[in-house]
């Protein structure tokens, strides 16, 4: 007896659009990581995803808009890991250790660092992109500051500086150390990066050595 093929479910217009958008984002992420933001054209992205240039512009106003969406998703993925630490019913000591480990390992876990660097360079040169990117970065700092404030309340450790300033400082330190590690991996090795970030974090946030 011949088995009848299961009819393929037809996607709605919204589902088809979402699928196209996801394919374009996946293709762009892959190309940006290999060719860089500047080196990958809209045509390259559309071709890699299996769509037309028109399909690209039906989903994104520009390559820069797509870049911000990729960075937003990267940040949201990081937040999921951070949120998991806060939702665990752990003691103060365990929570402090987990947060410090999370921060000190951020550079090793951030596979899209060079895209963040390219976005910052683009923001420095392109006023229109700068407005959009800086609004996103402001939101990112505010969310991190909220986590810092919540962490301080949860473990009962008073903050030495305002949460927004600490968020800015911790982000700047992490980015700077990762930049050095990317440029000179022979000397700024993962253990060195982890030690630097961990010790600075412990001293600034906890007021003690790691």
Task: Describe each PLM feature range.
Residues 69, 80-112, 163-170:
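Hydrophobic alpha-helical connector segments
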Residues 23, 27-34, 81-85, 115, ...:
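Solvent-exposed, amphipathic alpha-helical segments
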Residues 1-19, 209-210:
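N-terminal intrinsically disordered/low-complexity leader segments
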Residues 76, 80, 84, 108-114, ...:
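Amphipathic alpha-helical packing segments from all-alpha helical-bundle domains
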Residues 94-95, 108-131, 179-182:
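Amphipathic alpha-helical segments used for helix-helix packing
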Residues 130-134, 151-210:
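Hydrophobic/aromatic-rich alpha-helical bundle segments in the mid-to-C-terminal region
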